Amino acid sequence: MGRKSLYLLIVGILIAYYIYTPLPDNVEEPWRMMWINAHLKTIQNLATFVELLGLHHFMDSFKVVGSFDEVPPTSDENVTVTETKFNNILVRVYVPKRKSEALRRGLFYIHGGGWCVGSAALSGYDLLSRWTADRLDAVVVSTNYRLAPKYHFPIQFEDVYNALRWFLRKKVLAKYGVNPERIGISGDSAGGNLAAAVTQQLLDDPDVKIKLKIQSLIYPALQPLDVDLPSYQENSNFLFLSKSLMVRFWSEYFTTDRSLEKAMLSRQHVPVESSHLFKFVNWSSLLPERFIKGHVYNNPNYGSSELAKKYPGFLDVRAAPLLADDNKLRGLPLTYVITCQYDLLRDDGLMYVTRLRNTGVQVTHNHVEDGFHGAFSFLGLKISHRLINQYIEWLKENL
């Protein structure tokens, strides 16, 4: 073997080593998933390197790369797409072109991205909104919100809430031809967090007379108190969303102070005065038995009250919807929840399903045995189309 052949062989082995990740047997299209993961891993590694050099914040590097995937608000043969502002928050509105004798459904969608990255303009979210508007014959509002690290909680929550309240005004609904009795909210990941949080907040808002008919939460992040759930342990290094990245997202939501991130990773961020909150996220009593699988529940390690005083957001129900008491949950609308087996956020969704059902809320739970975080969003994968079809069919029947 010549030098050139040997060199190519070594390079090929290194590339294969970088790309290859062992995956469960029931996961479809494993090599396509590995390629996508290698792309994301490369971005993450570059972002880490740039941050170490002091040139750019880690999340800002992610945003720069993501901006190349943004598309303009362009109408097509089926859907009219416009970009406007709802209460100073930039949104995209998708309206079917075909005539309708009746008022249409309305769906308010919130993108994911760990409260730090993402946009309604990303091609995947744009395409999802088009499909939903066309197939559901619905007006879809896809909202933006200000992002960390420049903006921290509660800014993201407030932006989404203010845009939603604007949409729920009678004259706005009339402008877009939306039936005020058929409005729903949806979001994925951090967007699912925000969807759950603002839906709870609406229950206490006397100024909003129009109520949501449904909420649809796609692998939502619902609490930062316990980041050592069975799903975190099982999927800490799974594709697309690792434990270290998720904890970084959570901490950046509240502050750029990395001490919160370190405390979260060691489970020493919750002060003993807030110990009563753990009953809302106690997986030993809230997870179905088959998801516990021999995991042993350990009592929390309490930290000092200093972090909670500096950054109280991580104990705030508006950031952690699982911390809502049963009286609040009891008033929530019909709910659809997607959870994925190979997702570290799986148990957040499972616990929310249990708590909602325990308070009498009607819940449709779609647990995806071959699913993973991002399965709904990577539109080049077969599983994404399957989940979107199931999602839209549920909306057709219930919204």
UniProtKB/Swiss-Prot annotation:
- What does the UniProt record report as the effect of altering residue 78 to Q in this chain? Abolishes glycosylation at this site and causes moderate decrease in activity
Major localization class: endoplasmic reticulum
Annotated membrane topology is: Single-pass type II membrane protein
Which molecular function terms from Gene Ontology are attached?
catalytic activity; deacetylase activity; lipase activity; serine hydrolase activity; triacylglycerol lipase activity
Q: Which residues cross the membrane?
A: 6-23
Q: List the disulfide bonds.
A: 116-340
Span of the annotated motif Involved in the stabilization of the negatively charged intermediate by the formation of the oxyanion hole: 111-113
Family as reported in the entry's similarity comment: Belongs to the 'GDXG' lipolytic enzyme family.
Protein name stated in the entry: Arylacetamide deacetylase
